[in-house]
C-alpha cells in the first residue's frame, strides 16, 4: 500500500509533467530544478514530508561562516522559513522545511518547494556578498546574481 507521501509525489509528478518520480529505498526522492537547484524530498513518516534544498559544502576555512549560519537560521526561524542544517555524510549545508501531509496537494507541495528554492537563492547571495562561497556544482551564482542582496528573507 502506498504512503500518503507516495500518493502525493505521484500527483505532483503528474502536475509538473514528468513521467514518474519516486522515493528510493532510503525514502528519498531527489531532483534538480532548472539544472541549478538540487532538492530532496524525504518520506519521513505518515504525518509529514521533509523538503531539503542542498546549498553546498560547508566551508571550513572561513571562521565567520558558522556565526553567519547561526544568524541566518535565527532569521529564517523568526520568519517561518526553512531551517539550516548540516548533513555530515556529504558535509553539506541544507535548508530543511517540514511539509505536513494533512490537506496536502501537489500545488501546496510545489509552493513549499518554491519557498525552499527562493530561500536557497537568498542565502547564497547574502553569503556571496559577504565573501563566502558555498561549493555547489548545481547552484551557480552568475545564474541568480544580485549585487545588493544583503538581508535574508524567508522566501514566502
From Swiss-Prot:
GO cellular component: cytoplasm
Chief location bin: cytoplasm
Cell compartments where the protein resides: Cytoplasm
A GO biological process held by the record: protein secretion by the type III secretion system
Alphabetically ordered keywords of this record: Chaperone, Cytoplasm, Virulence
UniProt KW Transcription keyword: no
SUPFAM superfamilies attached to this UniProt entry: Type III secretory system chaperone-like (SSF69635)
Gene3D superfamilies: 1.10.287.390, 3.30.1460.10
InterPro entries hit by this protein: Tir_chaperone (IPR010261)
Family of this protein: Belongs to the CesT/SycH chaperone family.
Protein function: Chaperone for the type III secretion of Tir. Probably stabilizes the protein, prevents inappropriate protein-proteininteractions and aids in secretion.
Entry protein name: Tir chaperone
Organism: Escherichia coli O127:H6 (strain E2348/69 / EPEC)
Amino acid at each position: 500500500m502506498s504512503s500518503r507521501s507516495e500518493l502525493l509525489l505521484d500527483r505532483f509528478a503528474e502536475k509538473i509533467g514528468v513521467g514518474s518520480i519516486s522515493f528510493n529505498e532510503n525514502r528519498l526522492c531527489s531532483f534538480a530544478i532548472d539544472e541549478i537547484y538540487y532538492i530532496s524530498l524525504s518520506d519521513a513518516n505518515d504525518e509529514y514530508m521533509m523538503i531539503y534544498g542542498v546549498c553546498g559544502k560547508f566551508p571550513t576555512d572561513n571562521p565567520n561562516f558558522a556565526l553567519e549560519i547561526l544568524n541566518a537560521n535565527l532569521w529564517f526561524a523568526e520568519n517561518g522559513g526553512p531551517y539550516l542544517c548540516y548533513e555530515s555524510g556529504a558535509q553539506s549545508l541544507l535548508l530543511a522545511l517540514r511539509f505536513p501531509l494533512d490537506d496536502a496537494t501537489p500545488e501546496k507541495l510545489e509552493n513549499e518547494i518554491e519557498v525552499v528554492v527562493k530561500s536557497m537563492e537568498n542565502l547564497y547571495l547574502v553569503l556571496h556578498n559577504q565573501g563566502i562561497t558555498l561549493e555547489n556544482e548545481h547552484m551557480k551564482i552568475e545564474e541568480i546574481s544580485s549585487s545588493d542582496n544583503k538581508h535574508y528573507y524567508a522566501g514566502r
